[in-house]
Amino acid sequence: MINPEHISTYEHDDYVLMILDHLQNFSLDDEMACLPPWRRDVVMAIHHEQGKRQSVAAYRLLMMLLERHCGISGHVAMAYHDGGKPYLPHHPNIHFNMSHCRCAVACVVAKRNVGVDIESIRRFNDSLARHVLSDDEYLMVTASPSPQREFIRLWTMKESKLKMTGTGLRTDIKTVLYNDESIYDTIINDNYFVTVCLDNS
């Protein structure tokens, strides 16, 4: 089973975030047995084990958050908006989002529309930065003492905003932070950055 010692919990007035690292340290079969059939089918359709672990962990974190902080126990139905954003059709006042990276999985529940993105810290990629950053953002990143960390901070902000709105590829990622009034919280770990984006409209 998932070891609670490997879960970090961050409580905010508007949301609760859980992060699980050590993705190799739980029994995939045991955790799969705890899933509803529809989620098990989703996991089984994933071909590589790491992806299966990420999918299982994301749903298990959601179940923990719903039980501990929303008073909802047992399995819940999940549906998807046209843009691919998941939601809980039987609990319209509960907002949630999930994300994963190579080394960890994050799940957030909130009182308002929310998005989350988690990214592993990796080497700075100049061509990727030019592709996703505005000119001003690119100059800010390359002038930073740590371009890789500043880039990942902005990247997780952009991704969490796109996941909050559910617009995905329909939005120009270079301009997604322009005139933005969303609320952002970023958590920095030795291995990853996590950003939560809350709707402030």
Locate predicted features:
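Core catalytic alpha/beta fold that binds nucleotide/phospho-ligands
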Residues: 1-201
